[in-house]
Amino acid sequence: MSRLSDANVSIAKEIIGRYPRPKSALIPLLHLAQEQHGWVSNESMSHIAELVGVTPAEVYGTASFYEMFKFHPVGRYCIDVCTNISCQLLGAWELLEHAERRLGVRAGSTTDDGMFTLEDVECIAACTEAPAIEVNYRYRYRVTPDDFDALIDKLTAGRLGDEVPRFGTLARVRQRTTDRWSGAGTTAQAEVDAR
């Protein structure tokens, strides 16, 4: 997987400039890399390390602490099923088993058509609304197997519009940036569409 694109390097430098220490920008830069590629590769982590002046191991240490970063290619829709204690007590294991049957893959896998990646993840901080899932970082609460089936039907038919981003994973950094960055997503989208 490639390094950050030239357009995203410009964005990265602007992000880094917002912090008193470059290292403080690691998380938004990881989101930026994930948005560009759909996941965070070793090469992109090494590039981020160069940009902020730390080792690749420090970047990986930060990224691996969080469930939101993926270290392998994912499908168009990445479905994270929370199986932490609150969700477990309210049916997460049954929901995960149902999701595996419905999609025809085990957790940690992607469907043959590249449409869905199913992940079993730890806490997504939605304990009061368990069982909860995320689809490309958009939360779904109190999900039943029937709700899951309806969601998959809508995603397959393309009926959710802007509610769920079109590709891979969504960089939250775009949700918290200024308008002058808004055009940069076009480059990242073109790169993802090309894969």
Please name every model-derived segment.
Residues 1-195:
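Signature of N-terminal electron-transfer/Fe-S-associated modules in redox systems
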